[in-house]
Amino acid sequence: MAGTQACSATRFSCPPHFTEMSPDSEPSRFSLEALTGPDTELWLIQAPADFAPQCLNGRRVPLSGSKTVKGKLDGKKHRYRVFTSSPQAREATLLASSSEAGGRLTCAPAPSGSLRIMEGPQEYLLSRVPLQLIPTSLPPQIPAGLRPRFSAFGGSPPVTGPGSASALRSPTSGKRKSTRKGTDASSDTQEAVNRHGAMEVKTALGNLGVSVKKRKRYFMQEEMEAKTMEPVAELPVPSATSSKKRKKSKGTETSQVEHTEPVAQTEPPEGTFLFPTKKRKRQKEADGTEEVDGIVADSQPQVIVEAQEETILLSPTKKRRKEKRQNLGMEAEMGPPGVLMVTEHSEHGLQAEVALVSPKKTKKKKGKRVGETEAALPDDFEPQGALAPSKKKERGARL
């Protein structure tokens, strides 16, 4: 049975692309004893068929990574690319002859790594074949009839031309403006209602369609009228002259108050009822004129401003007529309750007083007689000043 098993065992057959060699009697350098030495390492090298190991004599080969190695053989330069890799388990199994086994092949230890040698691009090929240039990318070209759009998604497209301003305006812009105007008008009318407390103003202005500026002016005019009406209610005689007349009257008021001697109207105490006559006037010219001077000093602040402004613009003849009318009207009104003592100075009487009495003595007498007149007058006395003749009359009387 054993013989039959031995006869049936197949012999080792040489694989394809390998040649069978008979072992030499001399020990080979790839014997098992040489490979297992302490100073030797076993590396598996894979190279092309036409590779000549002599071209890499004296060259350093990397044991990790990859490197391009140049070699020279028979005057020709060769370039090889060497790749190294660590051995893997059961990647390759080496069989070596052993002298101990009588020259038979035995399994050798596993190699330390593997080297793969590949042919690189040769220099003569690189020098002869020109390199192909990579074309640079051209900038994008916009075809004719198209326009670039540099706006975000949902934005309005750019519009050029005369109609750009109208096209850019959104259809809702007019509505917004109208609503804003409506809110402004309503706020103005509400303020007016709060100030004056009248809801009719809002409805009237809204129906007329007055603009906002006109409404503001209307309300400002109402405020000014309300302010001006307050002092009118307190004063008995409002001033109706213009601004120009007021400016002229300011300069002349001081001079007229000093020089003029207006006619004083007095009310005597109850029980005496006297009528003004020419005889009494002439009798009391000497004594009454001095008393009138004291009364005039007290009645000067109550001179009516409006009458003074009117006398500046009137001629002297018209002034006299107007004074007579005023005196007659005042006498008609004040006639029944009491008697009005009107003192009028004639030109001859004034000239006589100026000639007899010196100005220094009159000043001293005025201070004394003012106190006498105040004591003689009743408690209810209220002097009312009327307008006196103009400056021309006074100058003529003093001359």
From Swiss-Prot:
Family under the similarity heading: Belongs to the eukaryotic RPA34 RNA polymerase subunit family.
Gene Ontology process terms (BP): rRNA transcription; transcription by RNA polymerase I
More details: It is in an antisense orientation to and overlaps the gene of the DNA repair enzyme ERCC1. This gene overlap is conserved in human, suggesting an important biological function.
Gene3D superfamilies found in the cross-reference section: 6.20.250.70
Secretion signal span: none
Function summary: DNA-dependent RNA polymerase catalyzes the transcription of DNA into RNA using the four ribonucleoside triphosphates as substrates. Component of RNA polymerase I which synthesizes ribosomal RNA precursors. Involved in UBTF-activated transcription, presumably at a step following PIC formation.
Ranges that cross the membrane: none
GO cellular component: nucleolus; RNA polymerase I complex
Entry keywords, A to Z: Acetylation, Nucleus, Phosphoprotein
Biased amino acid composition, Polar residues: 1-11
Quaternary data: Component of the RNA polymerase I (Pol I) complex consisting of 13 subunits: a ten-subunit catalytic core composed of POLR1A/RPA1, POLR1B/RPA2, POLR1C/RPAC1, POLR1D/RPAC2, POLR1H/RPA12, POLR2E/RPABC1, POLR2F/RPABC2, POLR2H/RPABC3, POLR2K/RPABC4 and POLR2L/RPABC5; a mobile stalk subunit POLR1F/RPA43 protruding from the core and additional subunits homologous to general transcription factors POLR1E/RPA49 and POLR1G/RPA34. Forms a heterodimer with POLR1E/RPA49. Part of Pol I pre-initiation complex (PIC), in which Pol I core assembles with RRN3 and promoter-bound UTBF and SL1/TIF-IB complex.
Chain spans, region Disordered: 1-28, 148-200, 230-297, 314-336, 359-399
Record-given protein name: DNA-directed RNA polymerase I subunit RPA34
PTM sites of type Phosphotyrosine: Y80
Upper classification of the organism: Eukaryota, Metazoa, Chordata, Craniata, Vertebrata
Sequence positions bearing N-acetylmethionine: M1
Pfam families membership: RNA_polI_A34 (PF08208)
